[in-house]
A protein has these predicted regions:
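The Walker A/P-loop phosphate-binding site
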Residues: 1-64, 76, 84-88
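Short, glycine/charged-enriched secondary-structure capping and boundary segments
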Residues: 31, 58-61, 109-112, 144-147
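Switch/connector loops and helix/strand junctions flanking conserved nucleotide-binding motifs
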Residues: 53-55, 78, 105-106, 138-142
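Phosphate-binding/switch loop-helix module in NTP-utilizing enzymes
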Residues: 72-125, 130
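Phosphate-binding/switch region of NTP-binding enzymes
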Residues: 119-184
Length: 184
């Protein structure tokens, strides 16, 4: 994955992570959360649709005492407002806006002005702001876009051991492509 993100998720900007179910999108977000909390950073997970699983985060060794989990009850507008307020409040190393459960039509209708506002707010902080969804929504407002696509399962004998994922990133219109295998 380092080949795709070229050294990690940038701070002080908006990154988009997109992919369908089983693409590794949530696993990557939980890995980021785990790394940030283990380094002593406070993090926020804005959960638009109540899909965050604390047990999965614990399994990845995330420190849940360093996590503020905001459940927006299926309301994307509330999630955007919460993200805006929390990124402006400062003090967080990672802010995740999880729109994965939001209907695609709703996510596409988020105005570019909202994305520009979030990007501008992130630029005044040291936080990594990551928006996750089924598709790229913020378009030109994000500095890094990572698109994941499931490729094929990885088998050892008759046991499923992981999944191969194709990833493509766009960094201010420079495209990098790589593939990686997630094995448990």
């Amino acid at each position: 994955m380092d080949d795709v993100v070229s050294g990690g998720i940038p701070r002080g900007t908006l990154t988009e992570l997109a992919g369908p179910e089983s693409s590794g999108r949530t696993a990557l977000l939980i890995t980021l959360l785990s790394q940030a909390t283990r380094q002593g950073e406070c993090c926020v997970w804005i959960d638009t649709d109540g899909m965050f699983d604390p047990a999965s985060a614990l399994e990845a060794h995330a420190d849940l005492d360093r996590l503020l989990w905001v459940n927006c009850g299926g309301n994307a507008e509330h999630a955007l407002k919460a993200t805006d307020l929390l990124i402006q409040a400062g003090g967080f190393g990672l802010v995740v806006l999880d729109l994965a459960g939001t209907p695609e039509k709703t996510a596409r209708r988020i105005p570019l002005a909202s994305w520009f506002r979030l990007r501008h707010a992130a630029e005044r902080t040291e936080a990594a702001l990551v928006s996750a969804g089924l598709r790229i929504n913020a378009r030109s407002c994000s500095s890094l876009q990572i698109e994941l696509q499931p490729a094929r399962p990885v088998w050892r004998g008759k046991l499923l051991r992981g999944a191969r994922v194709n990833a493509q990133s766009t960094v201010r219109f420079a495209v990098r492509t790589a593939a990686f295998t997630a094995v448990k």
